């Protein structure tokens, strides 16, 4: 009879965890490779379709007939997944992303380039884009008409690892336009190339903050407590709306100063800036008293809560009607307090897009004037 082998529980558990980790990583690599292969394949299928159509008639009826016939043949040979609407999307995908090749996300470019090494190209002279997202993400992105906005969403989606649902929401709520409206005009063009970088405290605040996902009805009167409860209940979405790096710490945080009790509505910590972020919710117009109270909260946290290595505390006042003049007159120019108007419904997309277009045209005109002055 063979000798029984007794294994150490800790050793076998270590082995088990190593195997699980290895298999998990392998599956992730396979999933990434499949995504890259699918997107690149559809990009080149779109290229084949467009090139075929260019050799024939240019009428819309001709293109529709081509896609319907191709759909029938591909379905017969390859099975489901090649409907007329799918081929129409593939064709549009190539048309959109072959213009300027807006993709350029750093995280997956190396993997994509490795995969591309042996990939058959329809035309050798065609430069290759770098696709870092799934096909589902690109179905959303290619419907964004503004190339700068599309590039911005693609970069942000890759860096922040947004799900399809999160990307759809950010596009639908005009994140690009809202960020553009909240920043200096000269920074509008930078958004499309770099995404939203965090260099100073004001960069973590998106203005105005859209709260329509809270499900609050129009023209209703809300107490601060009800609004706060709604925000707490959907904290994950709210953090996404606020910006990058927010970690929730507490609500109605109490502290005592000069034998008086004070309560901070919401306390966050921003891991990217390494600082506390205090939020106060106001339903009525912003007053001098509100600003003074927030300044006191900020001073308390800076003196008694934050560590030496951490940056100064940020205070944010959320109010229905922002009065920038009041903020400027009441606070020092470099104060870390900002008033962000929040709105219960999606912004008027047409108006926001018109504003951004106006700013872009103004920016281009100014750049042209600068070039002319340099040559004079």
Identify the residue ranges that each predicted region occupies.
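Basic, low-complexity intrinsically disordered segments
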Residues: 1-376
């Amino acid at each position: 009879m063979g000798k029984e082998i007794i294994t150490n529980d800790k050793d076998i558990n270590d082995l088990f965890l190593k195997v699980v980790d290895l298999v998990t990583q392998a599956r992730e690599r396979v999933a990434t490779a499949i995504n890259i292969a699918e997107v690149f394949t559809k990009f080149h299928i779109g290229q084949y379709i467009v090139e075929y159509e260019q050799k024939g008639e240019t009428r819309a009826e001709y293109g529709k007939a081509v896609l319907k016939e191709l759909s029938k043949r591909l379905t017969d040979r390859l099975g489901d997944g090649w409907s007329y609407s799918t081929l129409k999307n593939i064709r549009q995908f190539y048309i959109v992303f072959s213009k300027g090749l807006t993709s350029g996300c750093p995280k997956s470019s190396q993997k994509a380039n490795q995969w591309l090494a042996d990939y058959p190209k329809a035309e050798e002279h065609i430069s290759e884009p770098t696709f870092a997202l799934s096909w589902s993400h690109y179905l959303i992105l290619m419907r964004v008409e503004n190339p700068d906005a599309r590039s911005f969403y693609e970069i942000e989606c890759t860096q922040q690892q947004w799900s399809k649902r999160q990307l759809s929401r950010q596009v639908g709520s005009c994140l690009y336009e809202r960020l553009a409206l909240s920043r200096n005009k000269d920074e509008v063009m930078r958004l499309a190339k770099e995404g939203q970088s965090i260099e100073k405290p004001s960069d973590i605040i998106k203005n105005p903050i859209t709260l329509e996902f809270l499900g609050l009805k129009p023209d209703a009167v809300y107490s601060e407590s009800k609004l706060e409860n709604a925000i707490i209940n959907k904290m994950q979405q709210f953090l996404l709306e606020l910006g990058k790096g927010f970690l929730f710490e507490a609500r109605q945080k109490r502290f005592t100063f000069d034998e008086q009790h004070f309560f901070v509505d919401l306390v966050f910590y921003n891991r990217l800036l390494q600082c506390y972020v205090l939020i106060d919710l106001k339903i009525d117009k912003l007053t001098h008293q509100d600003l003074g109270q927030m300044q006191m909260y900020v001073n308390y946290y800076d003196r008694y809560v934050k560590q030496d290595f951490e940056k100064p505390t940020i205070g944010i006042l959320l109010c229905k009607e922002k009065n920038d003049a009041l903020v400027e007159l009441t606070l020092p120019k470099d104060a870390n307090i900002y008033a962000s108007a929040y709105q219960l419904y999606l912004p008027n997309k047409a108006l926001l897009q018109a504003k951004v277009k106006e700013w872009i045209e103004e920016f281009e005109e100014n750049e042209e004037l600068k070039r002319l002055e340099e040559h004079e």
